[in-house]
From Swiss-Prot:
Natural source organism: Saccharomyces cerevisiae (strain ATCC 204508 / S288c)
Keyword Signal: yes
One cellular component term from this protein's GO annotations in UniProt: fungal-type vacuole
Protein name as annotated: Protein ZPS1
Glycosites: 28, 57, 98, 217
Length: 249
C-alpha cells in the first residue's frame, strides 16, 4: 500500500505523539508507588514529605505515599478555605473560635513546606510497641530518635483514604484520624521540628475538650493538634457532601 507524502507526514506525527504521550492510569495503585515529591502537588508550591525507610516494602511505600498525598490535598483545602472566608467562616469559628488566623495559616505552611529532610518513616517494629499493641497502635513517635516515626501494620488496615470520607459514618462517629492523610498530619506534629518544639501539640484529644478549647480557650485551640484535625476533616467533607458530614457535636 502506498501513501502520499502528505498522509505519511500525518501518520508520522500521530505515531510521534503516541510515543511521547504520558501514560495515565484510571486507578492510583501504580502512581502511588512514586514519591509525591516527583508529582505535581496542587495547592502547594514547595510541598515536602518524609523519607520512607528501607524497612518498608513496596506495599508499605505505596500506601504511605498515598497518605502523604492526602496530607497535601487536605491541607490545601484548609488553606484555601482560610484565604477565601477568613475568621468569620462557620468552620473556622467551630474549631478555632476567635483564635489567630495567622497562627493557623502558619501551621499549615509549616506542615507542608517546612524541610522534612531528617524525618523518617520506618516499618520495622524496632521498639516492640506495635506487637505489644496490635489492634491499637497504628504507629508511634520514637522518643529515642525524635525525627523517626514507626508505622505499624495496623495503620494499613485501619486507616482509610480521603476518597472514603463521609461514606463510613460521620466525622464525629469515626474521628478524623480514621483517615490516613489526617492521621499522618498528627504524626508529623509529634516530631519536634514539625511541632516547633511542642508549640502545637496534643493538649486536648477528646471531642469535648476540643470544643471547649474553641469556646473558652482559643489561644490553645490554635495550638492543639486535634483542633486542626477536626477542622480539616470538616472542611474537606463539605467538598464531598453539601454541608459536610460532621455529625452531632
Amino acid at each position: 500500500m502506498k501513501f502520499s507524502s502528505g498522509k505519511s507526514i500525518i501518520f508520522a506525527t500521530i505515531a510521534s505523539l503516541a510515543l511521547s504521550a504520558p501514560v495515565t492510569y484510571d486507578t492510583n495503585s501504580t502512581a502511588e508507588l512514586q514519591s509525591p515529591s516527583s508529582q505535581e502537588i496542587l495547592g502547594w508550591s514547595h510541598a515536602t514529605f518524609p523519607t520512607i525507610y528501607q524497612t518498608c516494602n513496596e506495599t508499605n511505600a505505596r500506601m504511605l505515599n498515598a497518605a502523604f498525598k492526602d496530607t497535601a490535598e487536605i491541607t490545601a483545602y484548609g488553606k484555601d478555605r482560610l484565604l477565601n472566608y477568613g475568621v468569620d467562616d462557620v468552620y473556622y469559628k467551630r474549631w478555632f473560635g476567635n483564635g489567630s488566623i495567622f497562627t493557623v495559616m502558619g501551621v499549615f505552611e509549616q506542615l507542608m513546606e517546612a524541610s522534612k529532610g531528617a524525618m523518617l518513616m520506618r516499618c520495622d517494629d524496632i521498639d516492640g510497641l506495635c506487637a505489644a499493641n496490635p489492634n491499637y497502635y497504628a504507629g508511634h513517635h520514637r522518643q529515642s530518635a525524635p525525627a523517626e516515626t514507626v508505622i505499624c501494620d495496623y495503620f494499613y488496615t485501619s486507616k482509610k483514604p480521603l476518597s472514603t470520607i463521609c461514606f463510613e459514618g460521620t466525622i464525629v462517629d469515626v474521628g478524623p484520624k480514621h483517615y490516613a492523610g489526617i492521621d499522618m498530619l498528627h504524626r508529623y506534629l509529634h516530631v519536634p521540628t514539625m511541632s516547633m518544639d511542642g508549640y502545637v501539640g496534643e493538649y486536648a484529644e477528646t471531642l469535648e475538650e476540643v470544643v471547649d478549647y474553641t469556646q473558652n480557650n482559643a489561644t490553645y485551640a490554635v495550638r492543639n493538634t486535634d483542633n486542626y484535625l477536626y477542622y480539616l476533616a470538616d472542611v474537606y467533607s463539605a467538598s464531598v457532601i453539601p454541608g459536610g458530614c460532621l455529625g452531632n457535636l
